[in-house]
Amino acid sequence: MADAVGVSRSTVSNAYSRPDQLSAALRERILDAARQLGYPGPNPTARSLRRGFVGSIGVLFTSQLSYAFTDPFAVRFLTGVSAAAERHGTSMLLVPLPRGQTDARQAVENAAVDGFCVYCVADEEWALDVIRARGLPYVSTAARDDAGADERYVGIDERAAARSVAAHVAGLGHRRVALLADSVLPDAPAGPLTLAGGHEVWHPTTRGRLTGFADAFREVGVGWADLTVVNALGNSRPAAGAAVAGLFDGPAPPTAVLAGSDVLALGVLDALAQRADGTRPPVSVTGFDDVPEAAAAGLTTVRQPAEDKGRIAAELLLDPPADAAAGHVLLPTALVVRASTGPVPRS
């Protein structure tokens, strides 16, 4: 191209990337020659190698790609990420992680990005190790007690937030309680599980929420062994319904179900409304997140700012603060009481 027009290679490059550096007539002559020669322009991969950056940030999550477009909390989180990315003139790459760690590791190693938002990763330590080995920055969306001064995160106090909604339910007199969460243990079946305690839970977010629920009930004399932990095979309404199938049919069914997400809680409400015998047990149900559907269903829940979490995560990645402490962000949560919870029914 440069030889055909009689200019330097840098002048050809400027015609595409810095047109203000040459006259309009010269730029048009270069572009016209490119069209005649079939030259498509600078190779973006080669350009990124020369510049030392790609112009894209990655969002890691342990789920299928469709999760990013169907989960209501994820959609709002990614809205926040994309808003910040647009302000910084960069793009966003979704990096779903397969369940197998070998494939998941390759996904992190091969992602063409300048840094990562580590969002909703079940066991994130190995992912952080791979990112560090690549020499790339990252921001976690899970608050980490062991975070170093150079690590950045934006999250909530999962345990305290969960404790607040559980204390509300305990205050209504409920003592026979089920705790419902997604993927409590790797490869566990749907339905009730036997756990020695919250420390066995796989996912750090789920672990924080289940432990917070248990904290509140321990204060009223209900120990971990007296709580029914229920595993759902996915964060979806059908998965929640399948997980609680038969849960209310025994002689002493739970009078309340505390779910680790609004989506799961809505699935429990669906299951209660669709019982084959036409009866709807007087069960209190709570969620977590306060997605738009929660208000319409009258769901008691914990509100957390999804879009703010995404926006701040991307800002911390793209414009890191000079003060390391400013890179550790805890967002506020709020208990939202609605009609889905009430006093324990009298015998």
What are the residue ranges of the model-derived segments?
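Hinge/beta->alpha junction and helix N-cap segments in small-molecule ligand-binding domains
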Residues: 64-74, 95-101, 145, 154-163, ...
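Short beta-strand elements of ligand-binding domains
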Residues: 93-97, 117-120, 135-145, 180, ...
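Append "Primarily bacterial transcriptional regulators
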Residues: 1-4, 30, 283, 335
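Flexible loop/turn connectors
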Residues: 241, 245-347
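Short beta-strand-centered segments that line the small-molecule binding cleft or hinge
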Residues: 102-157
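Residues within the alpha-helical elements of helix-turn-helix
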Residues: 3-4, 15, 36
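N-terminal helix-turn-helix/winged-helix DNA-binding helices
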Residues: 35-69, 88
